[in-house]
Amino acid sequence: MKNKIIFGVLVSVGALALLSSCSSIPKNAKPVANFDVNRYLGTWYEIARFDYRFEKDLDNAIAQYSLNADGNVDVLNSGYNFKKEKWVSAKGLAKFRGDKKTAALKVSFFGPFYAGYNVIALDEDYRYALVAGKNLDYLWILSREKSIPEDIKNKYLKIAQEVGYNTSKLIWVKQDKNSPFENEK
């Protein structure tokens, strides 16, 4: 009986941790309002990111988003592993955490496990985006082109710093190859 109670408590704590991890956003960050997912779809080049094990040793990283029949967003991430000298890709699924006009989503590449994906800055033409994860360990700067203007870069770095990110830890992603996965969905 005691083991069943302990097991029940552990399952409950695990479920709470999982739920909170997929719905959180850094304290000082706010997802973009009046978000239009249709304008966000398509190819985004990764300009900068923190060092994550899922993207370790990747250059030329891109993310491609397309709307599926359920109204959720199919994700195809790809990049060139410069140590293994080969292209890699991962397919995922993004879902809105609430109102579809708010850029607060959760994304999964591993079955039922989701992580926060929050667009916290976006230019009016949907060319540049600043994306926060669930906490201050996850941050991306994205662009529709392989580079980003210096003024946009500085603006997004300032926003990230105001949220609490240590932007000195950003990795600036090399974009010098064309992905064989580009425009593949």
Provide a role label for each language-model segment.
Residues 2-185:
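A beta-rich soluble binding module of mature secreted/lumenal proteins
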